[in-house]
Amino acid sequence: LKLYNDSFRYLQTDHLDYYLLHSLGRGGLEAFDDRFVNNGMMSLLQADREKGKIRQLGLSFHGNQEQFDELLKLHDKYHWDFVQIQMNYFDWKHADGQRNVNAEYLYDQLDKREIPIVIMEPLQGGRLANPAESVANRLKERDPKASLASWAFRFVGSYPRILTVLSGMVYQEHLEDNLRTFKGFKYLTDEEKEFLGTEIAGIMASFPTINCNDCKYCMPCPYGVDIPGIFKHYNECVNEGEIVQSTGQENYRKLRRAYLVSYDRAITSVRQASHCIGCKQCLEHCPQSISIPRELRRIEAYVEKLKRNTL
């Protein structure tokens, strides 16, 4: 309740146009009840919406299909004014097995109920703005002048139920590129949507990357492991075709040395995967439901094999 009241004080306003319940889904209805129902918060939020103190009440979803369906069943009771979901042309049909729910399903279910949608991760943590060379080449063949990021933004922006698209911009160039994309917005054709959601996403799905979007919710690690940094380095090597498969591979020595040197440069030794003890503290914080300790063990095993020449 204090956090809720402080929001109005910090923002120096007597009302909020959009109030979002963050990160619902994980833990199911039991977690939702503990956070918002049993303490009376949902009753208060509904009452404040009636008074106009909150204009639109919604949620951001992080979970699997069963948890999503449970939350939508509450729509008749609470009337969600908007829902924030992760949606991009890769997750449209290729969401990983742990989250178990494609963005296509999330969108369709919300569209049926006429619930406006806010999009998070339209670039999947930057992955769609900097894909593997083979993917980038295919996109450039279609439109040499279009930025790689613009394809991803146009994909999510071309669906009619979308209320707004979030974009984590770091540099001035990002802002300028986004303005070019959304000013005089060009809707994708059905063929272009299929091209991105099936062909391009299919190529990307063939790369064994880790579905980390660099949100850093898993940090800090109590043992100092740079979890997002390790995953980012590994994914970049996968996308650039720099992962070694066996000692008999062409350019084995060159690729082996390149990975080990770049790993040490990207991640200091005291923060590398070998320092993970499997405490699992990070698991509950990951919105992508990545099995973080397992992936760190896999990377560490790969590094050790490279060092020992035992692939």
Map each language-model feature to its residues.
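Structured C-terminal cap/extension of enzyme domains
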Residues: 79, 105-311
